[in-house]
Amino acid sequence: MAQVGVQLIENGEAQDFTVDLGRVPVAGDLIELQGTYFKVASVTFGIDSAHEALIPRVVAEQFG
């Protein structure tokens, strides 16, 4: 599993999560979270201070 920081933008509101995905998504991918599909807008990498590790950070917008 890949631990990924995700910022979901739904109805103009942003929510931040850390989730385990099967792989690191790339821009344009669709991911399903909480029964809703989101389109990945961008992927960056940042330090997760709690785990002292480099993790991907995804910005995704509600799809459809």
Q: Where are the predicted features?
A:
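Short, solvent-exposed secondary-structure boundary/capping segments
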Residues: 47-60
